[in-house]
Amino acid sequence: MTPIFFNQQYPTLVDICARWQLVYDANATFELRFESDTLSLHKRDEPKLDGIVVDFVTGAVAHRRKFGGGRGQSIAKAVGLKQGVMPSVVDGTAGLGRDAFVLASLGCTVTMVERHPVVAALLEDGLRRAYQDAEIGDWMRERMRLFHGSSLEALSKLALEVDVVYLDPMYPHRDKSALVKKEMRVFQSLVGADLDADGLLAPALALATKRVVVKRPDYAEDLDGVKPNTVIETKKNRFDVYVKAAMK
């Protein structure tokens, strides 16, 4: 059970917290609010910080969908997206779902796995609103879903056919931009860095039939010390690609 502060008089919040096994704690560092049909996370000792929400419909995520470079994006190349090839993807470290959304918007079917229940609750709420949206709702319902389990091992028991497993473990950020600082400060204080991230590679390789893609900061070492087959570099990050079989 994960401690969280919330308004116990609000049935919607009570239901969400019960669903994700979040237990009320008057002294919890974090608060969940439900306002304007949106679930948001707040750090109670930093009231000036905006709440964190998952929003697939507006803002930066929507802008990237419309103007982000389509299949030419490095992430699309990394997962093997090309003409006639729409791989099924498991995002094993979904976070706020941004990379998963990019892949879904390009045609992949994406199953998100998120082990922290507060983050999973935010994801589920973002999906709920996206599914109802007139512009993106139809394909979102077809292509993007949240797995109600906290690990790749749990997912593997469903015996899904998965082409690609995508991993973006939380790594201590050096970036000083205001947005990254704000979101990452709240996020990292909630979930912490993925100190056991090296343990993700083996189950990912067991689950994926075609490849595993690991997003890393450019200064980070290889995950679990395993050298990738190929690396796609961007300005600040790189995608390490572990190939098991050709994309068809």
UniProtKB/Swiss-Prot annotation:
Q: Where in the cell is it found?
A: Cytoplasm
Q: What is its EC number?
A: 2.1.1.242
Q: Which reaction does it catalyse?
A: guanosine(1516) in 16S rRNA + S-adenosyl-L-methionine = N(2)-methylguanosine(1516) in 16S rRNA + S-adenosyl-L-homocysteine + H(+)
Highest taxon, organism lineage: Bacteria
Record Pfam families:
SAM_MT
Similarity comment: family membership: Belongs to the methyltransferase superfamily. RsmJ family.
Q: What is this protein called?
A: Ribosomal RNA small subunit methyltransferase J
Chain's gene name: rsmJ
